[in-house]
Regions:
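Catalytic alpha-helical scaffold of carbohydrate-active enzymes acting on polysaccharides/glycoconjugates
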Residues: 1-133
Length: 134
């Protein structure tokens, strides 16, 4: 038993955080940069997220009156601006999730990718992200 319990709103006994990573088809492009455009099956699976799942998730959370956190790579922010616009229009937040799941070799390389993702956030989301997840 906790000796100093946290007082949750409305008498709740706990809190739960659910968040989404919208990686879309970014993973195939970093894993197979030379021929990713020919790999239609994984690309199609990846596009399901921003094109089908996100609208369904947003509608569910709209009905429930819940706000959500999405962590989205910068490449996906640039590639799926309609999904980004819908997420933001619903009052949800978008966190920094790298640029393209790159594997930076050194600190300058890591900073370059991090900054590139920040640029996407500023351009498409209107400012800096509220948080970061690797």
């Amino acid at each position: 038993m906790i000796s100093n319990p946290i007082p949750w709103p409305n008498g709740a006994r706990c809190a739960c955080v659910i968040s989404f990573d919208m990686d879309a088809d970014s993973l195939i492009h970093i894993a197979r940069p030379g021929d990713s455009h020919d790999r239609l099956y994984p690309i199609s699976m990846g596009r399901y997220g921003p094109q089908v799942a996100v609208p369904r998730i947003l509608e569910t959370y709209r009905r429930l009156g819940i706000k959500q956190s999405f962590f989205i790579p910068g490449w996906c922010i640039e590639t799926y601006p309609d999904a980004i616009e819908a997420i933001l229009a619903g009052g949800h937040e978008i966190g920094h999730h790298g640029y393209l799941h790159e594997d930076p070799i050194d600190s300058p390389d890591q900073r370059r990718w991090f900054e590139k993702a920040l640029e996407a956030h500023r351009k498409y989301c209107g400012g800096n992200p509220a948080g970061y997840r690797a």
